[in-house]
């Protein structure tokens, strides 16, 4: 525990187990039974917070609440404690002459962290604090370990992630973050359902790792004796459903990528992918900004949010900027005129952009963007027109086939969404997959694998389609002002704890 040495901890463990033994000796179940609550702490505040001390005394409002003891004080025949539930804390006042000898003894010997139920009357103290005067006190669960020091909480950030249950007990901010996360996903579903989308479920284990450029996790199916991959994207199964006639589909689910851990990356994360027949990337741009603005309004009550030092305006319409124009604007390099690989490499050298020898012109354009532009994009910005070399599943632009009808959304210098007009030409798609295979042979283990079954599905005919993927964890980070992805994942990936 943070501010407690091993000797102190061991002493507390011994004392609490002695109390546990004493409770059982008295015939009291220290891990009790169902308790009927009439109100939460927020109910008490919203219903009775505006009443005066005198009004509450006159009304004698009876309530029953339950929660965890977070503070406790008093001696003799009366004492105070603060009891915490999901949304907050409320003070309780326990008098021996009101609850009786046995229940007062339970209160007196209760420890911080114990879960209790209280029946009583709502009142206000002389200083105006809304409280409950107990008429009944029930021990619901005996806590056998002491909570972290109430004044310091969990100082060790890693401990917060490893022992999220302690973080949730001691940090209201952390609890609110995860309540907000749930609301964000709920509003996302509601928006799509109201706009005619069908929620579906597709496999998490794939025979071929496809739909993104990433290293997969592998597993083995014993009964079928075959290697499988944990999905790195949801995309290709959803597009098969578009072929099948499900015209507007989405899935919210876990995706797995065998890559590094950082403040923005976790190997297991949550995505939403959606696809709409007869739409294109411009339609999806509008849907994206409208949906994110809707979520912000419903969950936060505003489209103006604070993230770190930045005030972000999520009200549509957002900036739209071609990747080549963005590079020219922020670095001066101009890729609009067609050029050879040698010319592109020379341009990279002039602008101190690091590249690999195997890169084609499109890869070099993307490196320019990542190294010279990305960290400048603070307000919501759609970057569109990605090179075909880095977009194996996107449709080529009709006016300039070097580029694709694809966009990525950047906010606070982070990618939050990836979308495109889907490539529905099976011949072109096969050629793109073959080009990706050559990249794999040259050492790019994130290049796309060949997927013959997907090609066959396209051969039956997929309508023009717009598709979108949003990393939900990053969206939650944005809307809760969280600096690290670990702050919005209940149980993030961690190294084994060293003894």
UniProtKB/Swiss-Prot annotation:
Q: How does it assemble?
A: Homodimer.
NCBIfam families tied to this protein: lysS_bact, PRK00484.1
Kindly give the Pfam families that the UniProt entry links to this protein.
tRNA-synt_2, tRNA_anti-codon
Query: Organism classification, top ranks?
Result: Bacteria, Bacillati, Bacillota, Bacilli, Bacillales
Catalytic reactions on record: tRNA(Lys) + L-lysine + ATP = L-lysyl-tRNA(Lys) + AMP + diphosphate
Q: Which InterPro entries match?
A: Aa-tRNA-synt_II, aa-tRNA-synth_II, aa-tRNA-synth_II/BPL/LPL, Lys-tRNA-ligase_II, Lys-tRNA-ligase_II_bac/euk, Lys-tRNA-ligase_II_N, Lys-tRNA-synth_II_C, NA-bd_OB-fold
Q: Which UniProt keywords apply?
A: Aminoacyl-tRNA synthetase, ATP-binding, Cytoplasm, Ligase, Magnesium, Metal-binding, Nucleotide-binding, Protein biosynthesis
In Swiss-Prot or TrEMBL terms, this protein is called Lysine--tRNA ligase
Q: What is its main location?
A: cytoplasm
Question: Matching HAMAP family, A to Z?
Answer: Lys_tRNA_synth_class2
Q: Please give the cofactor(s) recorded in the UniProt entry for this protein.
A: Mg(2+)
The scientific name of the source species is Bacillus cereus (strain ATCC 14579 / DSM 31 / CCUG 7414 / JCM 2152 / NBRC 15305 / NCIMB 9373 / NCTC 2599 / NRRL B-3711)
Q: Which PROSITE patterns match?
A: AA_TRNA_LIGASE_II
Enzyme Commission numbers on file: 6.1.1.6
Superkingdom assignment: Bacteria
Compartment(s) of residence? Cytoplasm
| Gene symbol of the encoding locus | lysS
């Amino acid at each position: 525990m943070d501010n407690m040495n091993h000797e102190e901890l061991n002493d507390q463990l011994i004392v609490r187990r002695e109390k546990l033994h004493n409770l059982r000796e008295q015939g009291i179940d220290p891990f009790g039974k169902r308790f009927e609550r009439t109100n939460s702490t927020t109910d008490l505040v919203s219903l009775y917070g505006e009443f005066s001390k005198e009004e509450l005394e006159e009304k004698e409002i009876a309530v029953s609440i339950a929660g965890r003891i977070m503070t406790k004080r008093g001696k003799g025949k009366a004492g105070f404690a603060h009891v915490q539930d999901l949304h907050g804390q409320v003070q309780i006042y326990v008098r021996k002459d009101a609850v009786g000898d046995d229940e007062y003894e339970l209160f007196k010997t209760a420890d911080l962290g114990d879960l209790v139920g209280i029946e009583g009357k709502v009142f206000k103290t002389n200083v105006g604090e809304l409280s409950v005067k107990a008429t009944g006190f029930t021990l619901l669960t005996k806590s056998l370990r002491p909570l972290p020091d109430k004044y310091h909480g969990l100082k060790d950030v890693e401990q917060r992630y490893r022992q999220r249950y302690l973080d949730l007990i001691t940090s209201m901010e952390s609890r609110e973050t995860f309540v907000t996360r749930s609301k964000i996903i709920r509003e996302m579903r509601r928006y799509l359902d109201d706009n005619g989308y069908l929620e579906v479920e597709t496999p998490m284990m794939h025979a071929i790792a496809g739909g993104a450029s990433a290293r997969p996790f592998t597993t083995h199916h014993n009964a079928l004796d075959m290697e499988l991959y944990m999905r790195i994207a949801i995309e290709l199964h959803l597009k098969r459903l578009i072929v099948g006639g499900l015209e507007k589909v989405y899935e919210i689910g876990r995706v797995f990528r065998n890559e590094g851990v950082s403040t923005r990356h976790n190997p297991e994360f949550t995505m939403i992918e959606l696809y709409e027949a007869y739409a294109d990337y411009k339609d999806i741009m509008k849907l994206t900004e409208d949906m994110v603005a809707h979520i912000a309004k419903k969950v936060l009550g505003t489209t103006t949010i604070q993230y770190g030092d930045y005030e972000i305006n999520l009200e549509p319409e957002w900036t739209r900027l071609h990747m080549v124009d963005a590079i020219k604007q922020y670095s001066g390099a101009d890729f609009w005129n067609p050029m050879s690989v040698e010319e592109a490499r020379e341009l990279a050298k002039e602008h101190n952009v690091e590249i690999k020898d195997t890169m084609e012109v499109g890869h070099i354009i993307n490196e320019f963007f990542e190294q010279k532009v990305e960290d400048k994009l603070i307000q919501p910005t759609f970057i569109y027109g990605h090179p075909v070399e880095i977009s194996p599943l996107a449709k080529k632009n009709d006016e300039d086939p070097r580029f694709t009808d694809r966009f990525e959304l950047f906010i606070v210098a982070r990618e939050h969404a990836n979308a495109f007009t889907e490539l529905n030409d099976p011949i072109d798609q096969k050629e793109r997959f073959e080009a990706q295979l050559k990249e794999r042979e040259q050492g790019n283990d994130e290049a796309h694998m060949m997927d013959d079954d997907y090609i066959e599905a396209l051969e039956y005919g997929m309508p023009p389609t717009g598709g979108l993927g949003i990393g939900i964890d990053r969206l939650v980070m944005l809307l809760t002002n969280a600096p690290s992805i670990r702050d919005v994942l209940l149980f993030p990936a961690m190294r084994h704890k060293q003894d």
